[in-house]
């Protein structure tokens, strides 16, 4: 990745080699060209020699040479155009293919076989068009999802049709976040062969390190920590704001904008760069599919990368390829869900198919992935100093199939291919030299949901343990993938306005608006607001839940107050087999963790009986993390964490078999993959805020250090 492009013929040849580096694919493609050319030439000869004797030995040799010539011409067309630095797009290549095939067919028949095609039933242009069309269809089927086709028809066209920054000795960072992928699951995916590009990086240029994501182990807290170095008062993915008496949900654009506004100082990690497919913008100058930038109350006005969205949507190859792959992924999800049901695999979600998730998986795992990486590579060609994008497909599938399932790990195969594309762009096409980082915001732990284990939800349990007149409400979750798809529809709606008044783009605008009108009713779910004002509010985020008691006051209720109003509730929760511990505050303002065999005072450090945190890893670290979490202004009066069972599983309070948000298992076990030339601390990194310091130092080093200084 230390080679900068220059306008020399040698570098252009290197680019050609980069585009055509898949030799297995090349052999298959060339074999097809030979077969198609042979068939086309046979038709041409038979049309002119209906009454003529069979071909002589010399003519048979000429026929073989003709087939080889036609195949080579079709095969070398695009590399030749790249070498000449000509604009590449499907229309140019198709037109030149028809003309070149027509000319070669005329030469082969008129000169070598002494026959004229002008009066034949199949004129040369018709045969040439048929040959070119057949080649296009076959190559589309053969190379639907590989480097050769993607780079041939997308990257080259971007390089020569878009304005790129001038070559520079600057350096930049491309950071790809894999939502929900733990350190050990990444290693498992590499060992199983799902991520050959990552395996190659590990063996040549990069190092893999683990870090603890901290509490809560979820995306909004992690991204605030990674981008700004602080994630104050984000107690979970969803919580109750006592002061304003409202629900806050991290993947609602208005609430994401509020989180951004609270934490941004203008010096975020992404300042001057690009945010793609994230919850928060990190002070980026440009953004696409970033939830916090879509809200009317957004305080910062990041430039929306509508041009990337429009270019992707109306490129016949990229959109068509992604649409076909999305449908194939839909078929794959149906097959996997049926196989799981027939095999009676546990744990599993019986409503996995048919459900809204079936469509959401297709859109998040393929469509959003391809769009995000398409935008990443365009922004690399513009020479942006830092680009941060999130892949949400693994997290979405792992929630429904389990983080270690082959269904979830297989989603990483498509991500890995795009990482190879990014590396190719960085080496041969970007105007500056880029370093690639791969990281996760948290991991996931597996296990049957709480409701599936015990027949009722946490809300229903609390409802059963309180008096009849007590109203208990629970905030219903919305899938993260659904929020990003709604973000896509919002971006498309806004992008269509950019096309208003341009006559030659009216059909494009009409197409985008029609798509938005069709998909929005199907994707928009129920809101996450409370209709009534309940006595108790349960906000579950994975296997961690905040429970709020309404006493008419803004401050946190103490354990004594809760016991006096709802006698026996706390003891019943602590003793339940599906609950690992309960955190609350005493009348003396001490934070305590209550477990089945004992308790720990987080404020003083005193332990009575068995330490409730013993099963959850580093006890000192967990105690500090829980203390900090409980002291946040918006944390619940009670914080409930599920049990961590002897088989290593947890019980999500949501309807998930892969979960995160609390403690237990691998949900706090995140990773970062970075170049070996980068510094990384020897001491364990125990939070996203701590990793921000490392990332900020890497960014400063990358932007200061000219090429060749490392």
Where are these regions (language model features)?
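Short, structured active-site-proximal loop/turn typified by the sulfatase FGly-forming signature C/S-X-P-X-R
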Residues: 187-225, 229-234
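Acidic, His- and aromatic-enriched active-site or binding-groove loops in soluble protein domains
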Residues: 229-241, 300-307, 409-417, 455-474, ...
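Juxtamembrane/disordered regions of integral membrane proteins
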Residues: 2-126, 130, 134-146
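Active-site-proximal N-terminal segment of extracellular/periplasmic enzymes that hydrolyze or transfer
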Residues: 150-206, 453
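Metal-dependent active-site segment of extracytoplasmic phospho-/sulfohydrolases and closely related
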Residues: 418-455, 591-594
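Active-site neighborhoods of enzymes that stabilize oxyanions during catalysis
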Residues: 244, 251-252, 256-263, 272, ...
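A long, amphipathic alpha-helix that forms part
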Residues: 366-367, 371, 379, 387, ...
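His/Asp/Glu-rich, glycine-adjacent segments
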Residues: 147-150, 229-386, 390-402, 507-509, ...
